[in-house]
Amino acid sequence: IYTLSHGSLKLDVSDQGGVIEGFWRDTTPLLRPGKKSGVATDASCFPLVPFANRVSGNRFVWQGREYQLQPNVEWDAHYLHGDGWLGQWQCVSRSEDSLCLVYEHRSGVYHYRVSQAFHLTADTLTVTLSVTNQGAETLPFGTGWHPYFPLSPQTRIQAQASGYWLEREQWLAGEFCEQLPQELDFNQLAPLPHQWVN
């Protein structure tokens, strides 16, 4: 576990999965504290690379060619959230308030190198993901994070969105809806919803 700090902010990061295991302001958790179990879904936040979520049927067509993906966890039939959250990352630089980890993946459809940089200032955590395709073919890539927030009556969230995807069977993205219902509109600071939202 790598521990970064700056003023009242503290961040714990693991090289197993490149996950955040905790982020605090003084003693207040800003993300759900991780269990430090080596399992990304027990962490505070994990990286999504080379894409997020699932691909229907574990297959996609890109530039006229079909690509087949293999499930990457025992408990889901899909190639879930890519590989970064399951891999062993390497530390390439570290200071009291900054850390840079890299991960290289060279099996299956995707061959890539991703770097994840963490930086604390007095009042901000900045996390940056950068991925480079190292395969022979051009492929679609995406990056993101899967954060877990503390669930309490005081928890508030704000995130810009102009729409959302309905969830269909097997947690796959369904139809895109441009009209956000009030309980899912986080363009302004709002409490967390009371129902499951994926």
What are these regions (language model features)?
Residues 1-69:
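Beta-strand-rich N-terminal accessory domains
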Residues 1-5, 40-43, 100, 106, ...:
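Beta-strand-rich recognition/accessory modules
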Residues 2, 20, 99, 125-127, ...:
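Hydrophobic residues embedded in beta-strands of well-ordered beta-sheets
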Residues 4, 103-141, 145-147, 151:
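Acidic, contiguous internal or C-terminal segments within carbohydrate-active enzymes
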Residues 7, 17, 54, 83-86, ...:
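Residues that act as N-cap/strand-start positions at coil-to-secondary-structure junctions
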Residues 29-42, 67-89, 156-177:
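Glycine-rich, pocket-lining loop/helix-strand segments that form or immediately flank
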Residues 72-122:
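Extended, loop-rich substrate-binding clefts of extracytoplasmic carbohydrate-active enzymes
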Residues 140, 148-198:
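Active-site/ligand-binding surface loops and adjacent short beta/alpha elements
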